């Protein structure tokens, strides 16, 4: 076992989702500077769902042309695209084009789509590559995958968020009774500790580190000794379920693992059943309904309205909610790694609890730009704490479901991945028209919005 290989596996895992996770925690600084404004989170949610064309293509290739697609050229391609896209974002994220009904952040949205394709495709290519190494390096890879959310969140906390200053400006309003002068306030944002450009360059550097780690995992002589024999790799690649996922500290994301069903033999068909049969059909339906529900909430519904629920309380509240909730996800994984309670009752209680906190978030978003306690520091503290508890509780639920379904066999994990994507897709499709078409949620101005 090589420490050098462990470090490379960890750095490789960090590159899996660092770009999109970084985009989410940087939104508090981006939404105030682009034409889409508060609508950007809902756009980003639907973009990520569209990016599933990447893993869909890889999955279909593995399903209908098994053994034809080598994941290594795909990984080189997507990581290189990630490096270039994040680098371009650093210089183009503010650039707009005028078309249709006004200005749009074409560069930001198109590059975000590329990054979404990169990260979504990593879910079905990085792990098959790790199967080429000895099994003990899987644990380190999953630690890196968990850090892909934690590292950009910590950097964003250091970055901070610009303080809002309101400056007087005069505006003339012409009425039928005469010319009346009224005082308006202009919003000015003080720069953060370092710029959004610097943050995207950091993400580009992280993707370059991932690319370098991948190169060394393929080419370094010390790592070559850690590779399995070709026969062992081929056998494992045809039996993805043989990986011991119980070693993973990041069990909350079974949807990020390749769960491909290759009906090539009786042994595989047998393993594709729901394993131990520990749970009744009703209990399994309950588990999958909960899985779809929590993924709809955490991956689409609530992230789409995060700006509406937090920005009325100020940029600082939005910044803390975005970053601390990103930290809450790996914290939930860490807790579940040591306390993996497979209780359906606990799962139900945590789901109801998380949904309750989610309902509070949705209510504050619906009341935007004048939610409860808008003029009180308690309101800002409550919305940040609510976001953290919401993510923490439902992330733990996803971990428990992943553990349960992993024990039930390969077929259960296949259904797990499908239900996760279905829940996320339904959540995104339901929220996008409400936010972007019917405009049921209202944005505000930090200086001129007057609330009772």
Curated annotation (Swiss-Prot):
Membrane topology, record value: Multi-pass membrane protein
Catalytic activity as recorded in UniProt: riboflavin(in) = riboflavin(out)
Subcellular location: Cell membrane
UniProt keyword annotation of Transport present: yes
Glycosylation sites: 168, 174, 179, 193
Residues of the signal peptide: none
InterPro entries on file: Riboflavin_transptr (IPR009357)
GO BP field: riboflavin transport
The entry's keywords: Cell membrane, Glycoprotein, Membrane, Transmembrane, Transmembrane helix, Transport
Segments forming a coiled coil: none
Transmembrane segments: 11-31, 38-58, 73-93, 111-131, 138-158, 199-219, 285-305, 321-341, 344-364, 381-401, 412-432
Homology family: Belongs to the riboflavin transporter family.
Function: Plasma membrane transporter mediating the uptake by cells of the water soluble vitamin B2/riboflavin that plays a key role in biochemical oxidation-reduction reactions of the carbohydrate, lipid, and amino acid metabolism.
Name listed for the protein in its UniProt record: Solute carrier family 52, riboflavin transporter, member 3-B
Organism encoding this protein: Danio rerio
Lineage summary: Eukaryota, Metazoa, Chordata, Craniata, Vertebrata
Designated gene of the protein: slc52a3b
